[in-house]
Curated annotation (Swiss-Prot):
It catalyses: guanosine(527) in 16S rRNA + S-adenosyl-L-methionine = N(7)-methylguanosine(527) in 16S rRNA + S-adenosyl-L-homocysteine. GO terms for molecular function: rRNA (guanine-N7-)-methyltransferase activity. Pfam families: GidB. This is Ribosomal RNA small subunit methyltransferase G. Belongs to the methyltransferase superfamily. RNA methyltransferase RsmG family. It comes from the Bacteria. Specifically methylates the N7 position of guanine in position 527 of 16S rRNA. Its EC number is 2.1.1.170. GO terms for cellular component: cytosol.
Amino acid sequence: MPPDERAPLPLPAPAPLTPPEGFAERLAAIGVTLDAAVIAKLGDYLARLLAMNELMNLTSITDPVEVWEKHVLDSLTLLPLLEELSAGARLADIGSGGGLPGLPLAIARPDLKVTLVEATQKKASFLVAVAAGLGLTNVSVRAERAEQLGKGDLCGAFDAVTARAVGRLVMLIPLTVPFVRPSGLVLLVKGQRAEEELAEASWVLGRQRAAFVKTVATPTGKIVMLRKSGEEPKRHPGR
């Protein structure tokens, strides 16, 4: 049974984290403005993430200031790249782990339908519970392997797909591109060696019918932006 059909795990509900001084200015520098209610919900998410991290490995970053910078700000750098998505558009976050960047995006863009794909059952159960605790009715969770979902019922089902800290681009591109429709966006959050990985993975782009658009700097690295340019290649028996 998928985790989003189960009763959510009971989660501790600690006091929300408050953003560090100057955080609104940091957001403005990347072209993002959020109201106080959204900021508060992001702080609520971070508090729950750190509380549950004491029971399961969700993040190696545990400093209350660093999580705003390296998790929230890093994730929200994707927001300006998603402006073309209208209300009701579908976004998949592959290998979501503790919910990054999918949950901050779902909090900031409640008009999007966000699917978090996480194969580890414990982490998927956390995602279900935290989405329920935050009242995120626009979030669903699939506790299955992305390799299978991208070939199955979620193939071509999304307008955009994101992934963060999942693997090198030569592996990540074939994993993520199948989820989006033709002309759909693929946004991959990488470290400082993104260009090196792009060169390594250049041959994969043509095979996956994907085109490189640009890279965008984040507080911790770069976002690689791709756009799917065609339908999925047909697979023939025996190949």
